[in-house]
Amino acid sequence: MIPNMYKIAGELTSTVFHVSARSVAAQALSIFGDHSDVMATRQTCFALLASNNPQEVMDFALIAQAATLNARIPFIHFFDGFRTSHEVMKIEELTLDDMHAMIDDDLVIEHRKRALTPDMPVLRGTAQNPDQRQIGRASC
């Protein structure tokens, strides 16, 4: 996934990954929180946003979405994969009005306009063999 994250960040694509962080790549599988896998993605140019409790998970999810649309910087929103997901806590649910207040509709429309579509073809983020690259460089 990390190579794809470089491509997403390089194209300035508004993206949010919501990650329930657990220890997977260490010596033994553990259900308890370990952010080493998330920290392995620091060099991908994704912004990292950590939540500490269920209320923050919901609030920061909306904040991350609004921020990525505004800045066109991809985000990883992560939280403890066991403790936070199993914690019983009263939260104040976000309403649709809260979401509409945070998310600018014009930014959503602009994001959708940048989508790849056969009606408006555009070339972005290509991968080429050395011979094709040289032909392209020589033609400029």
Across the structure, where does each feature detected by a protein language model lie?
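Metal-ion/cofactor- or nucleotide/acyl-coenzyme-handling active-site neighborhoods
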Residues: 38-42, 89-92
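Conformationally flexible catalytic loops at phosphate/diphosphate-handling active centers
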Residues: 75-139
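Thiamine diphosphate
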Residues: 1-40, 46-69
